[in-house]
Amino acid sequence: MICVEIWSNRPDFCKMLEPLHPLLRQAFDPERFLRLGQQVLQDAFQHLQDSQEKKRERSMPWTAPEEERRFWEERLSAPEGLVPLLNLVSERSNRLQDPRYMGHQVAVPFPDGALVGLITDLLNNGGAVYEMGPTNSAMEDVLMARIGQMLGLPAGCGGILCHGGTLANLVALLAARRSAGKEGVDVWSDGDDGLGAVLVSEQAHYCVDRAVRIMGWGTEGVGLVETDDRHRMTRAGMEKAMLAMEKKGRRVTAVVGSSCTTSSGAFDNLEWVADFAAQHGLWFHVDGAHGAPAAFSERHKHLLSGMERADSVAMDFHKIMGIPALCTGLFFRGQEMSFLPFTQSAEYLWSDAEDPEWWNFGKRTFECTKRMLSTRVAAVLEEYGPEIWGVLVDRLFGLGQALAELIVQRSKAGWQLAMEPEGNIVCFRYLPGDFTDTEAENAFTSNLRQKHLEQGPQYIVQTRFNGKVWLRCTLMNPLTEAEDMAALLDRLEVLAQEVQR
């Protein structure tokens, strides 16, 4: 009664509601959307064609950070509209579709992915609870179980899709921490003593170290395992690191195998890691962000022998699986294990916070709202089947071996290969003439890479390990050919002469 009296004295908001603003009408006009879409798609086609045919001067249009910021400071002060903006972004961005782009570990996406993004961005369904995105929630659960078995995990496996391998590795280690909790103690609810630890290769991606620190275990919570001359963890190194952690009073909960390392592309012997984990009662996690797709290749799946014994596996669909960033799968050998990392009350979202409802992904993910990632994965399987991942891996890994062969053929001229590549990451350097010491070699290599960055036309990066600076190629584009890689070496030889002057 009181509520009725209050509302009876309020203004008539329905009559006061203003007509739809012209800007909003314009923004939501379907016919305008169609016109813009046709133009944008035509421009995207031209960008794709020009990139594949190497029509632009450089695959990476380098500008210094401050120069690029000044450009956008001015440009964004004078808006010209959506189509001109998108064309300018395309013009000034890295051309991953150009076969001369051989830099970072980011997929050259199947062009179909842009069409998938068009629809999923328009639908914009979330995924914290089933009601926000029923289609992508159901597809995600089906796909994670099926693909997990393709990776060799047992029936009953499952997992989640998330935005990036860094997040996937963190969530996996949160599961490991909770799994290793003492009887009657729930670390999610009560915290822990801060004395946990994780063993990981000294060559592993820094995100594992970061995850351990986020969990509150600090620098001492990371047990770095020594590697051999091919950057693979050794059995003796794992035992040594375990003993060192125990002497510090640390409680090791997990060991992480790298498949493969970011800097050099080394694959840990996962059979050794699995044996070690079983011997010591540890959670066995595989950081397969880059290399786990080798499971789809008959030619290269031996690199992952032992992964089928893992408790959890992280795999980026946005690296060598042709899917736009970000899209990562975190697989658990048992679907029930995917509920370990998070349990908390959120009654307004689901009826029972402790009930393992697979359809409410907010119970299993760090993220609440996330993009419709499952549609990206499903689209590839619908159009090509999982076979395309196998042939893509074979092609990219084959390019890595071909580049290594080209480098070895020029070894007498000063070319050095860091190690024979197992995948599509190749580290090398060019040292013409005599250098006084390692410092001089490193300076020359860095200067050569900087000059190449500025002048192109290819794009590569550099890395450092064992005190030496190396040039580094990640062959991500299946359209790259042997002549493109030979042209890269030729170009570096020309630029080296300028550096030596």
Feature-to-residue mapping (PLM):
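Conserved PLP-binding active-site segment of the aspartate aminotransferase-like
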Residues: 424-438, 457-486
